[in-house]
Amino acid sequence: MAYTETKNTSWGERLGGAFKGVATGLVLILLGSWLLWWNEGRTYKKAGAIGEAMVQTQDVADISTVDPALEGKVVHAMGRADTTDVLTDPAFGVSTTAIALSREVEYYQWTEHEKSETRKKLGGGEETVTTYTYSREWVASPIDSSAFHDPMYSTAQPLSRNDMGPNDTLADFEDEELYAQNVSFGAYKLPPFLVHRIGGAVPMALSPESVDLQAIAVAIHVSDLYARRYLEAPVSADALVHVAGSTIYIGQNPGTPKIGDVRVTFQRTPPADVSIIAKVMSDTFEEYVASNGYTFSRLAMGKASMEKMFEDAKSENSTMAWILRIVGIVVVVAGLRTVLSPLAVLVGVLPILESLVGAGIGLVSLLLGLAWSFVVIAVAWVRFRPLLS
C-alpha cells in the first residue's frame, strides 16, 4: 500500500532556493576542478612509482630460505601463503584455521522507497507529489523506521499477527573480519597489508556443534513488539537459533523470514598460491616507497609473472584516472547548472518558457563544463608532465 505526500512551492520560494543554491554550485565547480587537477598529479606520480619499481624489481625463484643478499631490494616472488593460526569469532564461537575469517550480518527490515513527480504550475509555482512504498528486504544494518513517512510503518503499533509497523531486531551484531597474524610465504612472513589482499574466500561449513549457541542465545532480545507480531506463546532464545550451511539464522523459520530476523554468514580464506611484488625487509616485506613519495606493492592470486603484475598495475592506474576525470567533469557540469538555474526559475511564471530556458541552461552547462574541465586537465598535464608536454 502506497502513501503519498503533496507539497506546493510558490514561485518566490523556488527563486529564493535557486539563488541560495548558487553558493553550492560554486563549491561544486571548485571541488570538481580540484579533483581534476589532483587526479592528473596522482596519475602521473603513481605511474612514476610503478615505473621506478619496475626498473628495480628482480625475480626470486627460491623463497625456501631467507636470503640476506635481497635485503632492501624489490622482489617478485611466487609461493604458498600458509598459516597454522586458528581464528575464532568472539561473538559466535566459530573457529577455523585460515588466513581470514569473515562475518557478514543482515537484518530483515522494512525499507522505504520514494518516487517524486513534479508538476509546474502557471505563475511559477510547483506541485510535488511523493509516493512512498515499503518492502521487506535483507539489509546490512538496522533501519530506523521512525524516519519513515507513513505512520503505519513508523509509529503505529501492529495488530496481533500483523508485521506492519516499526522495524525491530532480535539481535544486534556487526560485520567483522579476522586475519591470521602469522602467514608464511616460504621462509618469509607476509605483513598485514599483503595478507589483507589475499582473496579466494569460501563459505564455512557450520554445524550446531561448531558454534557457541549459549553465547548467541544471550545476545538475543525478544521484544514485546516481536512477540506480539509473531509468537503465539513465549519461546526460549535458543529455539530461535538455526544453523545450516554457512549461515546462523536468528528467527522462527529461515524459510519464512519475519521483520527483526537476523542472519549471519561466515566465510573463510584458505591458504593459497600467491604472487607478490614488495621490498624485502629481514624475513618479511614492506611497501616500496618511490622517490616521489608514492608507495607500490602488489599481490595477485595464483602464479602471475612480473610483467603481468606490472601491466595490471598500469591498467588499474589508467582506469582510475579516467573514472576520476569523468567524476570531476560531472561535478563541474552540475555546479554550473546549479549556478545558472535561477535564470530558468525567473521565467518560471510560464512553465513552457521555463522548460525551454532550462534545456538551454543544461546544454550551456555541459559545453562550458567540458571546456573548463579540459582546460584544467591540460594545465595540470603541463604542470605535472613538463617534459612530455
For each of these PLM feature ranges, what is it?
Residues 1-13:
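N-terminal Lys/Arg-rich, disordered targeting/topogenic segments
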Residues 2-5, 38-41, 76-78:
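Domain-level marker for long, solvent-exposed, non-transmembrane regions
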Residues 13-42:
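Hydrophobic alpha-helical transmembrane signal-anchor segments
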